[in-house]
Every structure is written in structure tokens, then in C-alpha cells.
A protein has these predicted regions:
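A domain-start/cap signature at the N-terminus of enzymes
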Residues: 1-65, 325
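Loop/turn elements at helix/coil->beta-strand transitions in domains of secreted/extracellular proteins
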Residues: 61-65, 94-98, 134-138, 157-163, ...
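Active-site machinery of serine-nucleophile hydrolases
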Residues: 62-130
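Acidic beta-to-alpha connecting loop that harbors the catalytic carboxylate
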Residues: 72, 103-104, 190-193, 228-229
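Primarily recognizes the serine-hydrolase "nucleophile elbow" in alpha/beta-hydrolase
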Residues: 136-180
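Short beta-strand/loop motif that positions the catalytic acidic residue
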Residues: 185-189
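C-terminal catalytic histidine-bearing segment of alpha/beta-hydrolase fold enzymes
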Residues: 193, 199-292, 296-299
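Surface-exposed beta-strand/loop patches in extracellular or lumenal glycoproteins
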Residues: 297-315
């Protein structure tokens, strides 16, 4: 879409956004039709097959979507296929579309390679425009190797989800800083010693608690290290689902912490960059009519995508970076 030739009122801007969304949704529905009907999404030579279960009677546009990542990893195709089938039975939300995708590869890092992000974006878009999912009620969860994926995907794709839950996984090099606006649950058995999963979960629990103390408006979390449980938690991890469904996505948070890992992105909430870079870190907050960039490492140019959901665009605004006023008007 081209920029508006004149300034728009809030009502006119909302009307234009709705018109643009209707047009874009129609384009996406047509673009994704074949993949949706084949139950297999494709991108850059990779294929993400899906199976689903449905429950409840929410109206079109109000349905929730639960994306549940299976375990397995570098165990061979037959094992991963079995884990995929098992994942379809692990959880049953009372309402919504429960989708278990099959990882495109049979590697140890099958859920956090670079192609996964784009494939999940296609899956989410298809279920929004073709199956009536509410974009603010998309949830992510995963078990074992799927939990590894949630540790990684949660922080780097936080703006897509309402909440996420990690079960019995290992974070590898993931960090929780990007979870500022994504409620995050973790469930691990206290006796799940392989790869130090139990200790890693304790470490993440402490990190999330510290982040929550420093920033009480963010880092909502639930951490359960289950006594006497090993890698299999006897279904006690299902307690994550009613906790998750309390939340809706915060699409326009007043504070954003964006940390890029080895899979980079060009956008995150209402921030965008021309090119993502490993280790880049940006913190931006809105205070009244002031946009304040408090941290920007590894970023040459930063784009702020504004909305009346953040501040009153009918009034003057100010943008500050490192204590300097960059824009006022």
C-alpha cells in the first residue's frame, strides 16, 4: 500500500487498515489454498505436514489455534513419525484447533532450524484466513525436542503468540529476554537429568523471575519442576493449557525487548530493521507521547511502526534515542 496523501484521523486510519486487511486476507487465502488442502505447507524446499483435531463451537474468526511440536530429533524417520502421532494425543484444549505439525527434518534441532519460522508463519496465516482463527489466540507448545523448539521459537517469534509452553526440553543457546510480552510456561521433571534438562529449567525459572522483578509489566511465567518425575511427566504438564488460555496476544505492547539469535528476523511487534544481525538487541518503550529507544546494539537503522494503539497520533509525538531527541512534531 502507498502512503496516504494526507493525514488520517484515527477513525479513517482504522477503516483503511480494515480495508487493507480484507484485501490481504483474500490474497493469502488464495495463495495458501493448495497447501492448506494438502495439509502440507512449503517454503524454500522444506515441507511441514500437519494433522489436526477440533473442539468447541467458536465462531469463524474467534477460534483459537494450538500448535503442538512433537519430540524425537536425531532418532530416525520412523521414531519421529511415531512421536508426531503421539503428539496429536498428548493434549486436548477444550476449544480450538489443535495442530500437530511434522518437522521437515529428522535432526536433533528439527524445531529450531531457520526454515521453521517461515513455515510456522504460513501455517498460522492459513488457519487465520481459511479456518477462522483469531490471530490474538494462537498458542505454541512442545514436548522433548518440541520443547527445545519452544525454548528457541518463543523468544524469536513472541509477537505471533498469545502464550507458549515448554515441556521436557533443553534451551541450548536460547535466552528468555525476548519473552517480555509472551506468557511462558515450563514443565520439567525434577529427575529429567539427560542433557541437564532439570538444571536448565531451574536456571530459566530463576532468570524469568529476575526479569519479572526488574520489569513487572512483563515476563509473565509459570515454572513447574515436578518432583519425582523424569522425562515423562505422567500428564501433569497438561496443567499448562488452562493457564495459557487465559491470555491473548499483546500485539501493541508499550515496551519491547528484541534480541536476535542465530535465526534473525526483520520485524518484531512494531519494530523493524532492514537486515537482522546475530546478537542485535533493541529495547524501546512508549511513555505517554514519547517513544524512547533505551538500547540499540547491532542495529544501524530502526523503523518504528506506529499506531493509535500505542499513542495518540492526533497529537504531537517525540522520539528519543540515547537521551537525544530525534523527532518531535
Amino acid at each position: 500500500a502507498s502512503p496516504a496523501p494526507v493525514g488520517l484521523s484515527r477513525a479513517a486510519a482504522e477503516e483503511l487498515v480494515n480495508e487493507l486487511w480484507v484485501a490481504r486476507a483474500a490474497e493469502l487465502a488464495a495463495e495458501l489454498q493448495d497447501e492448506d488442502e494438502a495439509e502440507a505447507f512449503e517454503l524454500d524446499g522444506r515441507r511441514l505436514r500437519v494433522k489436526e483435531l477440533r473442539s468447541g463451537s467458536a465462531a469463524f474468526g474467534a477460534r483459537s489455534l494450538w500448535i503442538s511440536l512433537h519430540g524425537g530429533g536425531r532418532a530416525g524417520k520412523s521414531v519421529n513419525d511415531g512421536q508426531w502421532e503421539n503428539q496429536l494425543r498428548l493434549y486436548r484444549p477444550p476449544e480450538g484447533i489443535y495442530v500437530a505439525p511434522r518437522a521437515p527434518t529428522d535432526t536433533w534441532d528439527l524445531w529450531h532450524q531457520s526454515h521453521v519460522d517461515g513455515l510456522l508463519d504460513r501455517l498460522i496465516a492459513s488457519y487465520i484466513v481459511r479456518h477462522g482463527v483469531d490471530p490474538d489466540r494462537v498458542y505454541l507448545l512442545g514436548y522433548s525436542a518440541g520443547g527445545d523448539g519452544v525454548y528457541q521459537l518463543g523468544p524469536r517469534m513472541a509477537d505471533r503468540f498469545a502464550a507458549a509452553a515448554m515441556m521436557a526440553g533443553h534451551p541450548n543457546d536460547a535466552r528468555p529476554d525476548g519473552l517480555r510480552n509472551l506468557p511462558f510456561a515450563l514443565f520439567v521433571g525434577a529427575e529429567d537429568k539427560a542433557y541437564g534438562r532439570d538444571d536448565e529449567a531451574r536456571t530459566w525459572s530463576k532468570r524469568l523471575a529476575a526479569l519479572r522483578t526488574e520489569d513487572s509489566g512483563g515476563y509473565e511465567h509459570l515454572a513447574r519442576i515436578l518432583p519425582g518425575k523424569g522425562h515423562w511427566m505422567d500428564g501433569e504438564d497438561r496443567a499448562a493449557l488452562p493457564w495459557m488460555e487465559r491470555f491473548e496476544r499483546r500485539a501493541w505492547p508499550k515496551r519491547v525487548v528484541w534480541v536476535q539469535d542465530d535465526v534473525t528476523h526483520r520485524r518484531f511487534y512494531w519494530l523493524a530493521v532492514e537486515r537482522g544481525s546475530l546478537g542485535a538487541r533493541v529495547t524501546v518503550e512508549v511513555d505517554g507521547q514519547t517513544l524512547r529507544v533505551t538500547e540499540a546494539r547491532g542495529v544501524e537503522r530502526l523503523r518504528l511502526r506506529l499506531s493509535d494503539a500505542l499513542l495518540d497520533l492526533d497529537r504531537p509525538i517525540r522520539a528519543e534515542w540515547a537521551g537525544k531527541t530525534l523527532f518531535e512534531g
